[in-house]
């Protein structure tokens, strides 16, 4: 077959394509021109697509084989070559002969946009009219998903029953693990005349995206600014706390540049970096951040670390600006867990006490030993603090502009664990079976040895939900 015959074999004329679209045939239109050209005018139901090696590796294998795929471009030879490649992968593909110039009917002018994790969280907080379609397989979805989403696997997205589930007048967001299947779902929906956005980077990006909330407290005549930095998807919370231009950072995660940016924006100098304990659910960035900022690295003296740091003991007091931090050894979640009390009013409780529950004692496989210790820590060290003490935990979720914290007196009223006898507390804790965080033993080893400084590698290990707390029942 010569080159001209191949072109003819791989092409479809505009009239035939129009007829098929009018008959609502199962067609996916990929406009592979530049984004500017696409947005200046494109065939209705078409999607902007990039044809490159990454697309061929990550997107093409997931395209439905029961749909006709039509490529739209102004270069017939390039389009024919791409169609031949797609056919070799088992896809039913053609290109529009003579490109967009052959289309005699009305064009649409819309922008091709996807949505970032930060923007999606902002819209969820504002309770905008969203329809979140998670296109992963059911077992992936059940493991971890955005609460407001529903599961429609990619193989079912274009089916009539699935299409009927999509409400009208909603902003539709497709979601998958890394943003590849969700792109395909977006293309399939476009073929049915339904506009959707794909979550950029999928649940991976949802895991690592940041948001922060800042509040200044006046305590004993001192101004103390607390910036709560939150991982949107995982719920990890860390803190940048400043006084008189000096700042401390507690429980930093990768990428640690976020804390550097916060300090720079406020003209603060980071002087101390802390971890409340040896984390099991995320890779600590404390060592890397301390090295980057030239700060003192404070780690629990009751846990083993195989790198240089300042061992931090119970009852020590540290000065940051004109505020005083008091160290409290609070074992139970881990044997070496620490909490930090600032000016006797603000408590950074790590994974020991949350606003809706308590830390889990089983991540070192010593739950029977640690559970009664956790009870004693809570009742003899934390609940003896002033009832007006404001608790800032290391995990939780809240609206974008709010800080998640609670006064001790309020926690006592709403967390049943805090009102139980020791016997009932231990029995309830030990009877609560929960899955462990992803790769938790690998993460513990990394945090013990400090043998990672690559945020990308760290984030790959951490994908998944918060599993360090036991909610009150």
Predicted regions and their residues:
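Core dinuclear metal-dependent hydrolase active-site scaffold
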Residues: 14, 117-118, 225-229, 238-242, ...
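Accessory terminal helices/loops
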Residues: 2-3, 187-188, 192, 211-216, ...
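Short, well-ordered beta-to-alpha junction loops that form the rim of enzyme active sites
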Residues: 31-33, 135-136, 177, 393-397, ...
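Active-site HxH/HxHxD metal-binding segment of metal-dependent hydrolases
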Residues: 187, 234-235, 247, 254-328
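Active-site environment of divalent metal-dependent phosphoester hydrolases
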Residues: 140, 181, 256-257, 278-284, ...
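Conserved beta-strand hairpin/beta-sheet module of binuclear metal-dependent hydrolase folds
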Residues: 216-266, 340-350, 356
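Rhodanese-like catalytic fold shared by cysteine-dependent sulfurtransferases
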Residues: 1-27, 35-131, 137-171, 177-239, ...
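Active-site neighborhood of phospho(di)ester-bond hydrolases with catalytic His/Asp-centered motifs
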Residues: 73, 176, 249-252, 271-279, ...
